[in-house]
Amino acid sequence: MKKSLFCGVCLCALVAMGGTSFADIMVGVGAPLTGSQAAFGEQIKRGVEAAVAEANAKGGMNGEQITLVYGDDAADPKQGISVANKFVGDGVKFVIGHFNSGVSIPTSDIYAENGVLMIAPGTTNPTFTERELWNTFRTCRRDDKQGIVPGKYMADNYKDGKVAILHDKTPYGQGLADETKKKLNELGTKETLYEGVNVGEKDFSALIAKLKQAGVNVVYWGGLHPEAGLIIRQMADQGLKAQFISGDGIVSNELASIAGPAVEGTLNTFGPDPRNNPDNAELVKKFRDAGFEPEAYTFYAYAGVQSLVNAANAAGSNDPMEVATAMKEKGPFKTVLGDISFDAKGDPSLSPYVMFEWRKGEDGKYNYFQK
């Protein structure tokens, strides 16, 4: 039973890869399936597969079954563009993806020009929807809303402290750092240090020495978990006792694997955990019975499929432009994230960001819990 949970949708995906003649509605899954951010790609893949299996069992999109095809963008904009062009060439008309803002923004132009609707489960940079392309939607929140929470938290709790704001120079990481800095400054607190590092960097000893010399007692990180985990661990190794705060880019259990016990007390912002919603209890159990923990963006990807299918059925059409119109005009749509409506830009109606703290759970493992 555990192995066969999503076998139907996996079989459909294999059919699509081998030849598209059997496909009804082709939906592309664009995500980092390999590389340092593959954990997020796996969350998106699992969420999409589970939602498509459910949708197909209920009749699919206007009576047509959904077939999945996969594109590994490896969190790289250039590879993402190659994936987008491949999807277009294969006849894909709907995409769940991409994850990284730096990938979603350039690929959205390709999709828009070729009649492809995309729903991004993890793209939080405001620019993605601010351009108001007809085809861009997201099921996650925006960084201009996210930055308000840590900015206010640091202004309230470290008014006389020394704050360092670090980022990974990406549209997501630097964008989030800038939004956080903006709110912090608005509330009268000036950061002591603002600095970028490179994605993939491993040795942060020089940076941490700089933080120590500046007397920093709180570090805000705009970026993802691979670098965050190393910074947290190396801060502890070098004796820097500072509160580490970040955003939704570190919500992976891999953070604890990288940082070790030093992850204790780390704070991050994210939306309320949909695993704790009683309405999702059966679905959470299915994932866990299949050996997968549906953390972070799993449910955001699942909700993307639900929004797509519900909008198509409401429109009575599988034409991407007609579905896009329905997404903006015929909501709210019932999803695992709650009822979602989309505004004219493609942004969803979701509850605000909240703060989480990393600590040991009842199972003795480190995880993030809402404060």
Curated annotation (Swiss-Prot):
Residues 1-23 form the signal peptide. One of its GO terms (biological process) is amino acid transport. Component of an amino-acid transport system. InterPro entries: Leu-bd, Leu_Ile_Val-bd, Peripla_BP_I. It comes from Brucella abortus (strain 2308). This is Leu/Ile/Val-binding protein homolog 2. Keywords: Amino-acid transport, Signal, Transport. Belongs to the leucine-binding protein family. Pfam families: Peripla_BP_6 (PF13458).
